Amino acid sequence: MTVDPIHQFEIQRYVELLRVSGVTVSFTNSAAFMVGIVALIFFFLTYATRGRTLVPGRMQSVAEMGYEFIAKMVRESAGTEGMVFFPLVFSLFVFVFVANVIGLVPYTFTITAHIVVTAALALLVIGTVVIYGFYKHGTHFLHLFVPSGVPAFLLPFIVLIEVISFLSRPISLSLRLFANMLAGHIALKVFAFFVVGLGSAGFLGWLGATLPFFMIVALTALELLVAILQAYVFAVLTSIYLNDAVHPGH
């Protein structure tokens, strides 16, 4: 039996939409899952918030808790003025959270285990910071790279460090989510193949597979925790970065 833990991340083309100069634009399994995740979130929130009552039901309670959780996060990270970004942070958190959790279901596709997806989300965040920062503050936004109280002879080096740090944000933001989801799913797949391989050896094989099986259960629980934490970390860092667009001064 051949173990290919990378096969689960393979992009499959469903429909070719466009071909220009040898470059093909297709509707893939990744795109299908992204559309499905957005549709699932939309229908859940629509159903949960319809006919809102003073005493909320279970689904309304989940929606309200999610709202309050993200709203508190944004206020603490970017202040009251930062609430203008609440829709963005809430959408990113819910999207990453649902994508991570759905990716744990067998025979599904983990879109956040693809660097192109996480990089697009990270660039959306940093692009929003830059565009809103210049829109709101003009050239004063550049004060983000000039800390106050720095001696003049050190200023060029500090500015260079600040610029490099800012440019590294989308890289670290995308790689963190991508690497955690990729590594965890590969580990689960390897252990699963190991259990199946031992089980095919008969009774003694199944006895030997007992420990790896429980390790799979533990790894699955850990992966669920990681899926939730990574969505939380992504949202927290997004809020912190957006604070620079609201308050660019050090």
Curated annotation (Swiss-Prot):
Please name the GO terms that the record assigns under molecular function. Answer: proton-transporting ATP synthase activity, rotational mechanism
Q: Which Gene3D superfamilies match?
A: ATP synthase, F0 complex, subunit A (1.20.120.220)
Q: InterPro entries this protein is in?
A: ATP_synth_F0_asu, ATP_synth_F0_asu_AS, ATP_synth_F0_asu_bact/mt, F0_ATP_A_sf
Keywords attached to this Swiss-Prot or TrEMBL record, sorted alphabetically, are: ATP synthesis, Cell inner membrane, Cell membrane, CF(0), Hydrogen ion transport, Ion transport, Membrane, Transmembrane, Transmembrane helix, Transport
Under Pfam families, the record lists:
ATP-synt_A (PF00119)
Membrane spanning residue stretches: 25-45, 84-104, 115-135, 141-161, 187-209, 223-243
Stated membrane topology is: Multi-pass membrane protein
Residues spanning the signal sequence: none
Assembly with partners or alone: F-type ATPases have 2 components, CF(1) - the catalytic core - and CF(0) - the membrane proton channel. CF(1) has five subunits: alpha(3), beta(3), gamma(1), delta(1), epsilon(1). CF(0) has three main subunits: a(1), b(2) and c(9-12). The alpha and beta chains form an alternating ring which encloses part of the gamma chain. CF(1) is attached to CF(0) by a central stalk formed by the gamma and epsilon chains, while a peripheral stalk is formed by the delta and b chains.
Family that this chain belongs to:
Belongs to the ATPase A chain family.
What's this protein's function? Answer: Key component of the proton channel; it plays a direct role in the translocation of protons across the membrane.
This chain belongs to which protein, by name? ATP synthase subunit a
- What gene, per UniProt, encodes this protein? atpB
